[in-house]
């Protein structure tokens, strides 16, 4: 006869002894005083929640900070509706110059253990700490835009509407003529103009090496100059 206890019925159906088992089937029936019967399982409504009324992203971080629980750095990147909801926390992100990130996917939000939050948007950085939660609006942008790399400068040059329209040395028009390329982004009307440009660059490089040799006292071989 099955026990009236639901836990006893579940355990009796979960464990089935083998055909050659030496253990009596009686041992597979839980008693009324089984430790599982004495355990108190929490109800779904009693678990502690950190959603702060349905919030996500930094809402969880704020709840953890209030409960004095240490956290590791948390990073949120804009990704549509599944990303960090800046519209919900618009009061905490009052950017200068009217920047609205609520609909943007080009930002990254990072929160560190000490409570400092940084928001990276394009080439700008905004950061704030705990004091800003109380109304302080001090923002700072420590990121400085670095100089453009040579590769980026060459890309900009290729995108220029005047690209390969005139010789880079004598400025003659190149339309309808053979173009002699140098470094992939400089066009010349003749081999002579291109050779002069190569010589000019070689002399500049030699001057740099000579300056280094004077400063360090080391002998550095000068590059050869080859005319094409």
Curated annotation (Swiss-Prot):
Claim: Nucleotidyltransferase is one of the keywords in the record: no
Keyword Zinc-finger: yes
Superkingdom classification of source: Eukaryota
Pfam families: zf-FLZ
Triggers of expression: Down-regulated by glucose and sucrose but up-regulated by mannose.
GO biological process: cellular response to cytokinin stimulus; response to glucose; response to mannose; response to sucrose
Keyword line: Metal-binding, Zinc, Zinc-finger
GO molecular function: kinase binding; zinc ion binding
ZnF (FLZ-type) residues: 162-205
Signal peptide positions on this chain: none
Cysteines paired by S-S bonds: none
Family the entry assigns: Belongs to the FLZ family.
PANTHER family referenced in this protein's UniProt entry, alphabetically: FCS-LIKE ZINC FINGER 12-RELATED, OS02G0174800 PROTEIN
Job description of the protein: May act as an adapter to facilitate the interaction of SnRK1 complex with effector proteins, conferring tissue- and stimulus-type specific differences in the SnRK1 regulation pathway.
Subunit structure as annotated in this protein's UniProt entry: Interacts with KIN10 and KIN11 via its FLZ-type zinc finger domain. Interacts with KINB1 and KINB2 via its N-terminal part. Forms homodimer and heterodimer with FLZ2 and FLZ10 in vitro.
Protein name listed in UniProt: FCS-Like Zinc finger 12
């Amino acid at each position: 006869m099955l026990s009236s206890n639901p836990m006893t019925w579940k355990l009796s159906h979960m464990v089935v002894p083998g055909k050659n088992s030496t253990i009596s089937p009686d041992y597979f029936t839980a008693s009324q005083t089984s430790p599982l019967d004495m355990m108190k399982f929490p109800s779904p409504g009693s678990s502690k929640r950190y959603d702060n009324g349905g919030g996500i992203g930094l809402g969880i971080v704020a709840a953890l900070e209030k409960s004095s629980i240490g956290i590791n750095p948390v990073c949120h990147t804009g990704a549509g509706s599944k990303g960090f909801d800046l519209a919900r926390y618009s009061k905490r992100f009052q950017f200068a110059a009217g920047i609205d990130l609520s609909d943007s996917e080009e930002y990254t939000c990072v929160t560190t253990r000490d409570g400092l939050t940084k928001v990276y948007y394009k080439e700008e950085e905004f950061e704030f700490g705990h004091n800003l939660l109380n109304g302080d609006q001090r923002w700072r942008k420590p990121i400085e835009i670095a100089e453009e790399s040579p590769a980026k400068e060459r890309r900009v040059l290729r995108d220029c509407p005047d690209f390969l329209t005139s010789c880079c040395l004598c400025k003659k028009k190149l339309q309808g003529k053979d173009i002699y390329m140098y470094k992939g982004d400089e066009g010349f009307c003749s081999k002579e103009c291109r050779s002069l440009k190569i010589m000019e660059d070689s002399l500049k490089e030699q001057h740099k090496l000579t300056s280094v040799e004077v400063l360090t006292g080391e002998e550095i071989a000068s590059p050869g100059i080859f005319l094409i």
